[in-house]
């Protein structure tokens, strides 16, 4: 019958192809190539390059900054052999995304910089309470003095943060942030 022919010629082959496609998707296409050492090494290199920024040892993103962190030589990138970096990258975890690109620029331009990122804490020189989650506030406050010391030791300050997150918490964020940048500028810093 026509129904049997349709089933045998179309439905069964389409179903078999769908099952094979789903199986290939389920095993992520590994199949025989998983036995290849070249494939495994390429996959490991790819995974290493696509790790989150905070997993790289030269990205100094912390949940709480300590005195040791602001002295950590792994946090200084760019041109080697410069005793005291005059530039600092300061911000929350969003700033960590720029470490690699600023490192490349610094090497080419011949300067070094320190990077200091404090997860979920805005780059402010004042109390961040209105702009952070209550769970993060103790870490933000405990880190503030160390971060201030590192920021004030620099001549040039690059600031990055997840601005929209802090603005969602309070419409006063920009006023407080601009007061911080003005304070830094008044202290002779380039922001």
Identify what each model region corresponds to.
Residues 1-191:
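Extracellular/periplasmic envelope-modification machinery, especially enzymes
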